[in-house]
Amino acid sequence: FVCFFKSKEKVYNCLFFKKIGFYLMLLSLPGVIFKMFITLKMVISSGYLSLYVDTPNSGVERVIEFVSYKLYIIGVSFYISSNLSKKDFFKLSLFTLPISIAYLLSGKRGDLGITILFLIWYWFSFIELHKISFKKLLLSSLLIFIPIALLFQAVNDSRENGNSNGANIITNLSSFFAQQGVSGIVLPYYIEYEYSLPKDYPYLISPIVDRLNRGAQSSDLLKNTNYLGAELTAVLDYEAFLRGEGVGTTYITELYSIGNSKVSVFTGMFLLGIAILYFELNRNRPMLKYLSYLVLSTILFLPRGELFELFYEFILLIIIWHVAKIFMQSKVIKY
């Protein structure tokens, strides 16, 4: 057991991967800007919920959004797989943060939160390795967290009410914390309405089985997929579902739905804990650094998201990683 978790340090600085990542990020930039423009345009004209009920009219728009997003993820992943200097890290931040801020303006808060947390984790895991005192860590966390929490709450008020409610700091912080627990109602709702919900196959694997049929919230989505969040929202309030509203989902409910048992929850969380521990102990391995953005995104979204939401992104990145290694070896490009 101890040998299994023994960290296998293999730190290297592959200039080839860093260059690939940087150029792919630049290549994705026009498409990402276009996607942000379309997103902001939809929100301004039709409101935040239009993101969940409307789809681009042109197939070209879908292709641009799909390709640019994949190039962005691949580029960032290759870039962070090498040993970044502080200068390289700031380049990464200057590229990723403005994109996340643009999504924040459209009402999507999660992208900015995940980006900031990932950058902080990466900085202290690979750039600044010296220990920091608890007091400094606590103070820094508060200085970062409080403004972001207030900003997120203002965005939430704006997308729900059209403007900020002008409440004081304490009220806004309290509202922010209260909203973080909203996904806690998903499991009670599931238990109450489980006999009204379809169970063609486990909700846990819906992101894998139904990925190609994922789309706007509509009757077709309910007919062709088995997403827990969509099915549960439709059972609670079908009209609200069609308007783009949703109760969300959580991996705990996905696990519980397998046999409607606490055992499945504990088993799933135990296995997930092992996977996270393995990742943390071996994070210096090049491939795990390469996958770290997706890993952190998955972990941070788990309380309010699906366990396998990024399944195909992981598969794509793993395939591309091995293809890139084969290409390097064929060109005699040394690590």
PLM segments and residue spans:
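Hydrophobic alpha-helical membrane-embedded or membrane-associated segments
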Residues: F1, Y23-P30, S140-I148, E313, ...
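Membrane-embedded catalytic interface detector for glycan/lipid assembly enzymes
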Residues: C3-K135, I144-N161, L232-Y238, L242, ...
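Structural motif marking the loop-to-transmembrane transition
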Residues: F16, V60, I64, K86-S93, ...
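Enrichment for repetitive, rod-forming helical segments
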Residues: M42, Y69, S77, I116, ...
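Small-residue-enriched transmembrane helix-hairpin modules in multi-pass membrane proteins
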Residues: L51-V60, A149-L272
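Hydrophobic, Leu/Ile/Phe/Ala-enriched alpha-helical segments that form helix-helix packing faces
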Residues: I80-L84, L212, A216, A275-F279, ...
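Central hydrophobic cores of alpha-helical transmembrane segments
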Residues: K91-I101, L138-I144, M269-G273, K289-I299
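Hydrophobic alpha-helical segments
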Residues: G244-Y335
